[in-house]
Curated annotation (Swiss-Prot):
Reactions catalysed: 2-C-methyl-D-erythritol 4-phosphate + NADP(+) = 1-deoxy-D-xylulose 5-phosphate + NADPH + H(+)
Organism: Clostridium botulinum (strain Loch Maree / Type A3)
Record has rRNA-binding as a keyword: no
Cofactor: Mg(2+); Mn(2+)
Disulphide linkage map: none
Job description of the protein: Catalyzes the NADPH-dependent rearrangement and reduction of 1-deoxy-D-xylulose-5-phosphate (DXP) to 2-C-methyl-D-erythritol 4-phosphate (MEP).
Protein name: 1-deoxy-D-xylulose 5-phosphate reductoisomerase
Binding site for NADPH: 10-13, 37, 124, 126, 205
Primary enzyme class: oxidoreductase
Enzyme Commission number(s) of this protein: 1.1.1.267
Biological process, per Gene Ontology: isopentenyl diphosphate biosynthetic process, methylerythritol 4-phosphate pathway involved in terpenoid biosynthetic process
Amino acid sequence: MKNITILGATGSIGTQTLDVIRKGNEELKLVAISANKSYKKVIEIIKEFKPKYAVLMEENAFKIVEDFCVDSKIDTKVLKGMEGMIYISTLEEINTVVTSVVGMIGLVPTIKAIESGKDIALANKETLVVAGELVISKAKEHNVNILPVDSEHGAIFQCLRGNKKEEVKNIIVTASGGPFRGKKKEELIDVKPEHALKHPKWNMGRKISIDSATLMNKGLEVIEAHFLFGVDYENIKVVVHPQSIVHSMVEYKDGSVIAQMATPDMKLPIQYALNYPNRKESQIEPLDFYKISNLTFEKPDMDTFLPLKLAYEAGKKGGVMPAILNGANEVAVDLFLKGKIEFLQIGDLLQECMNKFYKSMEATLENVISVDKEVREYLGKKYDI
């Protein structure tokens, strides 16, 4: 029996993780959850799974859920805020913490969970992007597994198993290309949020959908891959693969390329991470090669999709530069969704902040949090948010 905490239980990954646990043949037990303010969803989760703990970040949502548990005589203990997230991430009985919250908010609870010896099923890209060196070193120190919960890194993880790191030539990260694959800059001038949110293959949250449209999502994954697998940026390639059947590949020095293929369904990497090192009966539709008919691969357009190019630059620069990139992107995506900037301005803001805020300093937790705050305050004042 594995005891699970889910940080971000009401989002896209969190919801699919619940589905995996639901069908987990009683080998997976949900002990604790966190959410921002989706109290209705939290109450439904409490009714079904009866977790010992539930954490809400927003005050009003916390009170509503707490009152529900008291009135319903349910034993779930309701906690609030970052302190609550850290508490449920470090519980002695927990085996694995699923970090599926979006953004920098996942960083501190993840580090605390690692320090408490918990395996991390990592769906929060920002944690490794802004503090990858710190996270990986702590994971090694505490003998903790960092298990990637996304299709690309989950695929790479599987393609590397049983092989020697020194035999790897390139890691090849596949990208669907998002809703604007094949478009040129001039065709993206009038893009609205509703257009960018329509992903052709994956059902995702709003922030990650915009990141997919700008290819920033793939840029963040490149930085993640660098830290997760210890591979230089020159040896991490991005290939656009619109069918989303090949989830990523590893090229070895002898010319062999090992690919992981499956029906595009996030439940597979979630199930693999939660049950690692074992494989369980599939919860997804089997791959039918007769229906696929063809698989295509293209080179990404880094001039049109500037954020991908900037992610490579930020990763190579190192230090706090990935934190600057990430902080600026989180704010820029929010500004775009609120109609305060145009789609193509997202990349421009990233470039502006990278030029303005870069300092040659180590990516310690304190430095990362400090520079992230500077970037957010600057953009907040600039756009009056």
